[in-house]
């Protein structure tokens, strides 16, 4: 069974230990109040949409190529939500262009304990990502917002890069959109610093998703 290691925490049972680790996550974000505003907006959007749709709240993380940041955000967000017992959230990712799930992003997840397996027989390169619940792997592949696999109405759009935020002035069907840009680890591709930079970006995203879903768990 995969053992996903959370940044700063090193714990497996997030739900049972929420009161111990969440204050540390909050403390880590105290020095970036503008970031907390964006993260709190995402928390509010998820809770507001839950009142409208009653059942499943869909969150779509968007970056230009749907290759690195949006894929990392989808995986971390869904894994953390699942671990916290937040069963009404389904996370997705998309891009303004279709490329592929970058190997360096996959490596960053594997370094945290995820198991990633390439799926055979798919028209588009696809991977199954196994987190803390191996019975329900995530199906990850690069796609645009028009892909059939994505919700078309009443979803939350989270842009994870400035380029996607500018490139999608209107996102049809979105209940709300949140700008949550991350620096692109792509600049390190092909250099000795790549593994470290991707790990840093993965950890940053994981920490912020711990904050978002930790707040939601605390409100239930």
Show which residues each predicted segment covers.
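Short polar/charged helix/loop
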Residues: 3-220
């Amino acid at each position: 069974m995969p053992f996903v290691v959370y940044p700063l925490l090193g714990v497996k049972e997030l739900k049972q230990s929420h009161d111990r680790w969440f204050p540390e996550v909050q403390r880590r974000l105290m020095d970036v109040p503008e970031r907390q505003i964006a993260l709190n907006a995402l928390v509010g959007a998820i809770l507001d949409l839950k009142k409208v749709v009653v059942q499943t709240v869909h969150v779509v993380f968007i970056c230009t190529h749907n290759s690195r940041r949006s894929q990392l955000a989808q995986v971390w967000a869904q894994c953390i939500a699942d671990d916290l017992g937040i069963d009404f959230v389904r996370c997705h990712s998309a891009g303004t262009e279709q490329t592929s799930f970058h190997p360096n992003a996959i490596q960053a997840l594997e370094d945290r304990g995820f198991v990633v397996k390439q799926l055979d027989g798919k028209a588009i390169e696809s991977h199954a990502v196994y987190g803390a619940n191996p019975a329900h792997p995530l199906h990850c592949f690069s796609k645009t917002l028009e892909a059939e696999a994505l919700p078309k109405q009443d979803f939350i759009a989270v842009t994870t890069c400035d380029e996607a935020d500018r490139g999608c002035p209107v996102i049809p069907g979105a209940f709300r959109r949140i700008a949550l840009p991350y620096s692109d680890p792509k600049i390190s591709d092909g250099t000795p610093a790549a593994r470290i930079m991707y790990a840093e970006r993965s950890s940053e995203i994981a920490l912020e998703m711990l904050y978002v879903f930790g707040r939601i768990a605390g409100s239930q």
